[in-house]
Amino acid sequence: MQGNIIPKAIAVDINKGPLERANEHIRANGLTEQITTRLSNGLEAIHDGEVDSIVIAGMGGELVIHILTAGETVCRSAKELILQPQSEVSKVREYVRNTGYKIVDEDMILEDGKYYPMFRCVPCADNSAWDNMDETTVTVCDLYGPVLIKNGNPVLRKFLVRLPSCSS
């Protein structure tokens, strides 16, 4: 907001406490004209076509998928989804791939000993390229991220190096 990257935002949470804290931060930073908050289960309080981008972050992958599924019409009216599941990341990647989205950008950070992947998805009318890939390649892309792999993401490398290996 303060970098003028987006003109307006809507912060949504299902719980009052986090929303009240968000409102405190919004007021403290003088952003009440730019950011509104809504108490809502997922995307229920967002109207079709109301937003260009949807960010779903900081929750498990199953919940991310539930929110995307329940709010499918709102998601379809947005230009992009930015997702940061805390678990079951491969299931979220598989879900977006199988529901007509393409992951166009990804990043991964390491913070306090934890790895956090995030990815940007856009609607894709033709995801048939995946049909021509063998099952192992698709599984690896779902597990580790097609863009992270393609770009040789250094944090992904750290993540992979830490995996246990068999010693003889």
Task: State the predicted function of each range.
Residues 44-50, 62-168:
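Class I S-adenosyl-L-methionine
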Residues 1-7:
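Conserved SAM-binding loop of SAM-dependent methyltransferases across substrates and taxa
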